[in-house]
Amino acid sequence: ETIDRHPDFRIIAAANTWGKGADLQYVGRNALDAATLDRFDNIFFDYDRKLEECLYPSEEVLKFMWSFRDAVLKTKIPHVVSTRGIGKVYKKDQRGIPVNDILTSNVVKNLSQDDVNTVIGNMSDINSSNKFYSGIKQLVLRR
């Protein structure tokens, strides 16, 4: 039996890659064949800052994490600064976890010292009154 597609039917699929399989950031992915890729249009969705503001209402966390994310993108250093990651920083800050512990376990994890220095050097629209920014600068000096 053939079932006709409803005129309003749409399929939306999401992926962390462009269909070419594993890379350095997403190692557990498989490539899709050309016929499958041909059936879909690629639409890039960036992180939604308004959603992040609603979920994690801390100007200090958001300003730091957005500046850090922007610097990562600007420098093309392969490092993910996701909404989920911002949430982890926010929740740990709310629980009173020390800033340096948050930075080490959730922000600069898996980055080399050179990459951290490069990212920090490219952060903008933030100043040392932000406890995360001053903390990361101190962390760099101790690493």
Spans of model-derived segments:
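C-terminal regulatory/interaction module of P-loop NTP-utilizing enzymes
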Residues: 1-143
